[in-house]
Amino acid sequence: MPRSVNAVASKKHRKKILNFAKGFYGARSKLYTVAKNAVEKSFKYSYFGRKNKKRNFRKLWIKRINAAARENGISYSNLIFLIRKNNIKLNRKCLADLAMKNNSSFKKMIKKFQILYLDL
């Protein structure tokens, strides 16, 4: 009885891995075993990259809010405190966008808070 090998599926799988490895340098894009390791590692890095992207954007938003708040004479932590006290449902992304694109309304918002809470 001849040896049964599923060559079609094996070839398809190898081709899929080599397609993922397109653009990699040298053997990483040509040889299956090397490409398999490179693709696996790249998937791992892309997974962590997606998590880091969220972290980095949050940091950026906080820096932008802090810079805009300090221009108006209030610290970031006090601004967040005042926003929470007034039950304003704006997240950091919206606040950063407001501070960058519509600075005049951001200033008005801060002035209103400072009038309400003069002790800060």
From Swiss-Prot:
InterPro entries: Ribosomal_bL20, Ribosomal_protein_bL20_C
Gene behind the chain: rplT
Domain of life: Bacteria
GO cellular component, one term: ribosome
UniProt record similarity statement: Belongs to the bacterial ribosomal protein bL20 family.
Gene Ontology BP term (one): ribosomal large subunit assembly
Pfam families, sorted: Ribosomal_L20 (PF00453)
Protein name: Large ribosomal subunit protein bL20
Organism: Karelsulcia muelleri (strain GWSS)
Alphabetically ordered keywords of this record: Ribonucleoprotein, Ribosomal protein, RNA-binding, rRNA-binding
Gene Ontology MF terms in the entry: rRNA binding; structural constituent of ribosome
Functional description taken from the UniProt entry: Binds directly to 23S ribosomal RNA and is necessary for the in vitro assembly process of the 50S ribosomal subunit. It is not involved in the protein synthesizing functions of that subunit.
HAMAP family reported in the protein's UniProt record: Ribosomal_bL20 (MF_00382)
